Amino acid sequence: MELLLSGCEAIEGEPSNVLCHNLHTGTLVSTFRQSSPAKNATCTTLNHLLSAQHTRPQLNIHNFGKEILDQSIILPEILICVQSSPCGSWLAAGTEKGNLYIWSLKSGALIYFFRAHYQPLTILKFSNDGMVLFTASNDGDVFAWLISTLVDQNSTFETSNSSVKAISHFSGHKRSIVSMEIGPGPIVSGRLYTASEDNTIRIWDVSTGNLLTTIALPSTPSCMTVDPSERVVYVGNEKGIIWIPLYTGSSTFSNNVKEKKRVTSVDNTTIPNAIGGMGRVVDYNDSRESSIISCQSPITTLTVSFDASLLISGDKDGNVLVWDSVSRQVLRRLVQYYSPVSFLQCKVDKISFYSNSSLSFPVLKRMITNEYLNSDVRICIQDDGVEQLMQPENILKISSDIVTQGSESSWRAKAETSEMQLKEAKRLFYELKQIHQALWEKYLQK
């Protein structure tokens, strides 16, 4: 069963609820009261719903087995964005001062906090493998932080905050970043999507930090989401929803009006061409597959279902609509809130709606202490060599080795050596074959 969690902004101090619907039938499954979800400040773990309050330093916790508020935790300062790791071990939070907090969800200990940006943080995203944390802010920059470095006990207690350095820096946007998405799969082969108030969407290669494509939009985006196969980017703005295909086979994106890419086909099968690339700037309407669906109210948030067959939108009037991603028609309206929709999330994992006292959420500490070093909670941080793989100098070194070793004379020498080795292998094979034939004939004569 695929569930949809949705919520709206709190108005005039009145708390709002988060509703849980069956995405495919529209049936109301559960209600989580007084959660007051804020945009980019609400997330879920395996057993809990977390929502940070924008008006006070407080984090509301809901157990999926209870409809009422489970607990409220007082925080060091007001959080404007939160995100939990896919493994359920870490909670990252950003503040208006640009501070980044890292808590352990196993013990509640404050592991680390430091000044990550000079301006307020807007969005936090973990990679799908949980190895890297991406932070975006009003300054238009995105930093990638290695989790194993942020939560390492040695770096926490034996070094200063200034020693923590991002493994990648994505810069180029001129204004605040309003939405950010990470492509599926391992982080070393993933892509990063950022939407900014400068009316552009930028697609980055995570491992190298290079800009792949810039998509120019007709107006300022308010939200963005990408389907799990990275085929289409959905953008919401004040006029409606924009479908932007990342691959096209009929009328492709071009760098200018006169130049058009040819459609490649093999056996009457069209091979899709990726838009942009090599840092090119393309316009959203350069493809026939792209389109704008007008809506009566400005779009505030978007998400897609597990198989990308459904697109779910929330607007300023409080409508939560389910769209068919192929026909681009509205299938149903799940709910209408009294304020703008601020939170949408699809969950495929089975959620237990039965109360369980053993699933209590730990109290988040407000200060860094060494108490958790002596606790019984131990987390093994696996070193997959992500930091080394994502270093640009390594890639440049590999490229230089290919260039230096790829001269014509060296390739000719390698080809001659391979040919001689092949001839020698054939000669030995024929000798061995003759010996085997002689032994076989001798055996038959007995």
Curated annotation (Swiss-Prot):
Q: Name one GO cellular component term.
A: heterochromatin
Q: State the InterPro entries in the record.
A: G-protein_beta_WD-40_rep, WD40/YVTN_repeat-like_dom_sf, WD40_repeat_CS, WD40_repeat_dom_sf, WD40_rpt, WDR18/Ipi3/RID3
Query: Which GO biological process annotations does it have?
Result: DNA-templated DNA replication; rRNA processing
Subcellular location(s) of the protein: Nucleus; Chromosome
Question: By its UniProt entry, which PROSITE patterns does this protein fall under?
Answer: WD_REPEATS_1 (PS00678), WD_REPEATS_2 (PS50082), WD_REPEATS_REGION (PS50294)
| WD repeat extents | 74-113, 116-155, 172-214, 216-257, 294-333
Source taxon at top rank: Eukaryota
Main localization of the protein described in the UniProt heading: nucleus
Q: Could you tell me the keywords of this UniProt record?
A: Chromosome, Nucleus, Repeat, Ribosome biogenesis, rRNA processing, Transcription, Transcription regulation, WD repeat
Q: Where is the signal peptide?
A: none
- What Pfam families does the record tag this protein with? WD40
**Which family does this protein fall into?**
Belongs to the WD repeat IPI3/WDR18 family.
Q: What interactions and quaternary structure are annotated? A: Component of the RIX1 complex, composed of ipi1, rix1/ipi2 and crb3/ipi3 in a 1:2:2 stoichiometry. The complex interacts (via rix1) with mdn1 (via its hexameric AAA ATPase ring) and the pre-60S ribosome particles. Interacts with rix1, gcr3 and Las1.
The record describes the protein's role as: Required for both pre-rRNA processing and heterochromatic gene silencing.
- Name used for this protein in its record: Pre-rRNA-processing protein crb3/ipi3
Organism field? Schizosaccharomyces pombe (strain 972 / ATCC 24843)
Name the gene.
crb3
